[in-house]
Curated annotation (Swiss-Prot):
Exhibits stronger binding to afucosylated IgG than to the wild-type fucosylated form. Residues 23-104, 121-174 form the Ig-like C2-type domain. This is Low affinity immunoglobulin gamma Fc region receptor III-A. Residues 21-209 are extracellular. One of its GO terms (biological process) is positive regulation of bone resorption. It comes from Cavia porcellus (Guinea pig). Disulfide bonds join 47-90, 129-173. Gene3D superfamilies: Immunoglobulins. Receptor for the invariable Fc fragment of immunoglobulin gamma (IgG). Binds with intermediate affinity to both IgG2a and IgG2b. Can bind to IgG2a and IgG2b monomers. Does not display binding to IgG1 or IgG3. Recognizes neutralizing virus-specific IgGs displayed on the cell surface of infected cells and triggers antibody-dependent cellular cytotoxicity (ADCC). Confers protection to lethal influenza virus infection. GO terms for cellular component: cell surface; external side of plasma membrane. Keywords: Cell membrane, Disulfide bond, Glycoprotein, IgE-binding protein, IgG-binding protein, Immunity, Immunoglobulin domain, Membrane, Phosphoprotein, Receptor, Repeat, Signal, Transmembrane, Transmembrane helix. The keyword Cell membrane applies.
Length: 254
């Protein structure tokens, strides 16, 4: 019955079923969750994905190159260096290659840390003024576009509960390490207003989605088959009618 489907419809059906059957991509998580760190920090990357039973084999990639020798779900970078900067991805036996996570490593006294670069409307923003080797930092000021936004006598995170377009801009922090006044580099925080809606979990399990696609394909095939069957019989009827009319016309002429 599948041969009754037009090629374009068959390809569309196969594509929809394939997409429904594909598992979710793997996801790279950072611990601590900051995408900007200082040299000598410790960073753990964890691959969140689907694994077959008793097999947690994980493939890690740095700037598109496979990291040989790292097969565990967690990848620890101890005493991180500037050359460790770049894009990280992971893949499991049951999950496709993850989207990349951009990690920046800076050699400086201070770094303004953020968990991501682009925020959606209503999301919370966490900014952290981090010192090299966690040296004591006090009298910390967070600035947006050169203007002070928050001051802490003792170092603390700057938390924005709900992001809006007004929070777009260039941020940095400054504070005292000992008697020395230090400033971080600038971080550009951008805002995506209603560009993409929140992710919504599927209403039905995967097997029900696949069964639905197959059922719809079967119904479409039956409908298409009936269409061609009726059209063929209609053509035959028209031919017989024309032949009958022709013979009847000849009989009248005689």
């Amino acid at each position: 019955m599948w041969h009754l489907l037009p090629p374009s419809a068959l390809l569309l059906l196969i594509s929809s079923v394939t997409k429904a059957a594909d598992p979710s991509k793997a996801v790279v998580l950072l611990d601590p969750p900051w995408v900007r760190v200082l040299t000598d920090d410790n960073v753990t990357l964890t691959c969140q994905g689907a694994y077959p039973p008793e097999n947690n084999n994980t493939r890690w990639f740095h700037n598109g190159t496979h990291i040989v020798g790292s097969q565990a779900p967690s990848y620890l970078i101890s005493g991180i260096k500037v050359e460790n900067s770049g894009k990280y991805q992971c893949q499991t036996d049951l999950s496709p290659l993850s989207d990349s996570v951009q990690l920046q490593v800076h050699a400086d006294w201070l770094v303004l840390q953020t968990s991501k670069w682009v925020f959606q409307k209503g999301e919370s923003i966490r900014l952290r003024c981090h010192s090299w080797k966690n040296k004591r930092l006090y009298k910390v000021t967070y600035l947006q576009n050169g203007k002070p936004k928050k001051f802490f006598h003792n170092n603390s995170e700057f938390h924005i509960p709900e992001a809006t377009v007004n929070h777009t801009g260039s941020y940095y922090c400054r504070g005292l390490i000992g008697h020395n006044n230090k400033s971080s580099g600038i971080v550009a925080i951008t805002f995506q207003a209603d560009f993409a809606g929140p992710s919504i979990a599927p209403l039905f399990p995967l097997w029900q989605q696949i069964a639905f696609c197959l059922m719809m394909g079967l119904l479409f095939a039956v409908d298409t088959g009936l269409y061609f069957f009726v059209r063929r019989d209609l053509r035959r009827s028209m031919v017989h009618k024309e032949e009958y009319n022709f013979k009847w016309s000849q009989a009248q002429d005689k």
